[in-house]
Amino acid sequence: SIWVSGVGVALGNALEQIAPVLAQTDYFMPSFDEALQITGKKEPREMAEVLRPFGTRVFIVKLGSRGCFCMDYETGKFCEVPAVPAAHPVSTVGAGDAFCAGMIAALLRGKELRASLEFASAAASMTVQVNHATGAFSSFEEVENYARAAGGRTF
């Protein structure tokens, strides 16, 4: 299972409210603000440590233009993936959703974790360059080509 974001939890007891589902969650991908609300921590590594006992397999916190932080609890490894730079940013509306969609699409195609994070970053980068939340890309291959052109990333 994949928990993306938007649970709408109340301040003060956010972790208590989502704790029961974290053990059934393979990929937990909150935004920085959501992770801050849930954990009370400002640093991604500290956020990851707070969430470790709750059983999610992979914690990914979206950091906007700074990229993302990922902790794979099964391997004990973490990584930070920089954002794919957007040449002409227009609006951040939908960027987090595009990141999650890109992550899910890459994982379902059998991509490794780091490659999936890079792909997700490319999808988010494409999204911030349009004036609406949808329509920035129409295919997996289009995002792959953009990622290669933008940063030489290969999948």
Label the model's feature ranges.
Residues L11, P44-F155:
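Conserved phosphate-binding/catalytic region of the ribokinase-like
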